């Protein structure tokens, strides 16, 4: 159960990082 939650959180963090990178461009 904990692993599933961690994966979900990581996915959300990755998405936020992608948006930030696009803004830097």
UniProtKB/Swiss-Prot annotation:
Gene Ontology annotations of biological process type: cytoplasmic translation
Key word Heme present: no
Gene Ontology cellular component annotations, sorted alphabetically: cytosol; cytosolic large ribosomal subunit; nucleus
MF GO annotations: structural constituent of ribosome
Keyword tRNA processing: no
Top-level division of the source organism's lineage: Eukaryota
UniProt KW keywords: Cytoplasm, Nucleus, Ribonucleoprotein, Ribosomal protein
Region of interest: Disordered: 1-25
Subcellular localization: Cytoplasm; Nucleus
Pfam families xrefs: Ribosomal_L41 (PF05162)
Subunit structure: Component of the large ribosomal subunit (LSU). Mature yeast ribosomes consist of a small (40S) and a large (60S) subunit. The 40S small subunit contains 1 molecule of ribosomal RNA (18S rRNA) and at least 33 different proteins. The large 60S subunit contains 3 rRNA molecules (25S, 5.8S and 5S rRNA) and at least 46 different proteins.
Miscellaneous information on this protein: There are 2 genes for this protein in S.pombe.
Function: Component of the ribosome, a large ribonucleoprotein complex responsible for the synthesis of proteins in the cell. The small ribosomal subunit (SSU) binds messenger RNAs (mRNAs) and translates the encoded message by selecting cognate aminoacyl-transfer RNA (tRNA) molecules. The large subunit (LSU) contains the ribosomal catalytic site termed the peptidyl transferase center (PTC), which catalyzes the formation of peptide bonds, thereby polymerizing the amino acids delivered by tRNAs into a polypeptide chain.
Entry similarity comment: Belongs to the eukaryotic ribosomal protein eS32 family.
Name this protein carries in UniProt: Small ribosomal subunit protein eS32A
UniProt source species: Schizosaccharomyces pombe (strain 972 / ATCC 24843)
């Amino acid at each position: 159960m904990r692993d599933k939650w961690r994966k979900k959180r990581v996915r959300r963090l990755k998405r936020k990082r992608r948006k930030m990178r696009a803004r830097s461009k």
